[in-house]
């Protein structure tokens, strides 16, 4: 019996290939050119020497793409936090980001346990996964302490989008969550300039 030999995209080689390097460079360019600037009130571009309070659920848990068939396996995801820090920008909100990391990991654990429990009672375990898309938890309220050392605030609104996770006409999905609304109103009442970023694969009503 003859077998047809074929090449596949998977690899066990830990070395980054020339192909990966080219694709990574192309993906970075596509991301840069795909950013849409809706409004700029003499804040952007941010100076690399600036002190920035980086806040919001997508700051260090940046959504890289879709889910389901829209997901891809890649070696590295660079978050907004990592990108800004690598550029030399001083991030002053590490306490807020650390607190959100704890909330995020706790939410992921609860989500995982729920799926594993439901999988025991269905014929196809994948159904338990598909019917329970992960929802990013809210962060703690932004306080005066979080912005006291900042020259600029960058607040990131993120939404998970993709197969099985379309926008819903609810707060925290298509609409801002109550937490996001309160945070933005609080920040707007202060004298520090604000940059609002939307990190989502679908529309969000502001």
Residues of each region from the PLM?
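C-terminal non-catalytic regions of proteins with extracellular/luminal or membrane-system context
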Residues: 1-206
């Amino acid at each position: 019996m003859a077998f047809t030999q074929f090449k596949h995209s998977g690899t066990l080689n830990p070395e980054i290939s020339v192909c990966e390097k080219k694709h990574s460079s192309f993906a970075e360019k596509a991301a840069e050119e795909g950013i849409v600037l809706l409004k700029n009130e003499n804040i952007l571009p941010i100076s690399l020497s600036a002190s920035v309070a980086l806040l919001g659920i997508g700051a260090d848990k940046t959504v890289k793409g879709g889910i389901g068939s829209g997901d891809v396996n890649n070696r590295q995801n660079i978050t907004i936090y990592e990108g800004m820090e690598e550029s030399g920008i001083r991030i002053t909100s590490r306490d807020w980001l650390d607190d959100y990391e704890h909330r995020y990991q706790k939410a992921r654990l609860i989500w995982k346990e729920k799926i594993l429990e439901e999988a025991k009672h269905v014929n196809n375990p994948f159904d338990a996964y598909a019917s329970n898309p992960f929802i990013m938890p809210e962060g703690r309220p932004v306080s005066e302490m979080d912005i006291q050392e900042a020259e600029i605030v960058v607040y990131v609104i993120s939404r998970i989008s993709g197969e099985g996770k379309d926008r819903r006409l609810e707060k925290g999905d298509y609409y801002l969550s109550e937490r996001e609304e309160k945070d933005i109103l609080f920040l707007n009442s202060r004298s520090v300039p604000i940059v609002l970023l939307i990190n989502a694969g679908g529309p969000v009503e502001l």
